[in-house]
Amino acid sequence: MPSLKEVKTKITGVKKTSQITKAMNMVAASRLRGAQDKMESFRPYASKFSEAMSNLSGGGNTNAFPLMDVRDVKTVELIVVTSDRGLCGSFNANVVKLTEKKMAQYRAEGKKVSLICIGKKGYQLLRKSGAVRENYSDIMAHFSINNAREIASDVADNFLKGTADKVEIIYGAFKSVAVQAPVAEDLLPIQPVVSSEPAGEQTMSGDYIYEPSSEEIMDAMQPLYLNVLVYHAMLEVGASEHAARMTAMDNATTACRDIVSNLTIVYNKARQAAVTNELMDIVGGAEALK
């Protein structure tokens, strides 16, 4: 049985750890509110933008738009979005696990795979794969639309040059405070929807009337499309990271309380044993004096 001093030292150490995890939980909860507000305010814009792009692409000649060029897929580029910091449970590991699954799948089909890593943790876990083409670390703490624009421009240039035939983005989507799920979404080529309206009609859905023409608007919107999708994924990861960290720190705090409780029982037993031994020594000494 450990000594009283050893057990007491362990209890003190675990209590200090509990204070740290509790503070980190509170910080994560505070940051989550801001990140969640930004994400939820951007979601409707991203959704409508994607819907408009799909409707526009479904109503014209897709061959006129380079970002819709569907060709034989020989090289796939995966954009992997993770956090820069850890201590958020299995959040980053789940995104990397999905990425590795996708890489194995495409390589089994004889396709080359390259990676763009956004976030330090993803890069640290994937750099040994030898597939990382570009790395954007240390931007997730204070990212902006300018970061998304830079990344989107790089991806578009790579696609237009024919270096990549297909582009997907993989990130941890925010479902709720308790649930963050890794998802993979196609970015390029832009997928058109099949329109049921007669050719030449300007209205692609009940929500839109395009003037002067859908082709001209599509040409103007294309450079913005990837910006929106990449920025949206980064916002989702920003909120998911804080939610995952809040949950992880809450679990850690609970675990610390359980450990302290168990150590306290051990301490009390050790103390009781020590007192019993002392009493036995006293009684034994008294008997010896008789």
UniProtKB/Swiss-Prot annotation:
GO cellular component term of the entry, any: proton-transporting ATP synthase complex
Principal localisation: membrane
Membrane topology: Peripheral membrane protein
InterPro entries for the chain: ATP_synth_F1_ATPase_gsu, ATP_synth_F1_gsu, ATP_synth_F1_gsu_CS
Compartments it resides in: Cell inner membrane
Entry keywords, A to Z: ATP synthesis, Cell inner membrane, Cell membrane, CF(1), Hydrogen ion transport, Ion transport, Membrane, Transport
Gene Ontology molecular function terms on file: ATP binding; proton-transporting ATP synthase activity, rotational mechanism
Keyword Zinc belongs to the record: no
Signal sequence range: none
A GO BP annotation: proton motive force-driven plasma membrane ATP synthesis
Gene3D superfamilies registered for this protein in UniProt: 3.40.1380.10, ATP synthase, gamma subunit, helix hairpin domain
Assembly with partners or alone: F-type ATPases have 2 components, CF(1) - the catalytic core - and CF(0) - the membrane proton channel. CF(1) has five subunits: alpha(3), beta(3), gamma(1), delta(1), epsilon(1). CF(0) has three main subunits: a, b and c.
Protein family membership: Belongs to the ATPase gamma chain family.
Function, as annotated: Produces ATP from ADP in the presence of a proton gradient across the membrane. The gamma chain is believed to be important in regulating ATPase activity and the flow of protons through the CF(0) complex.
Protein name in the entry: ATP synthase gamma chain
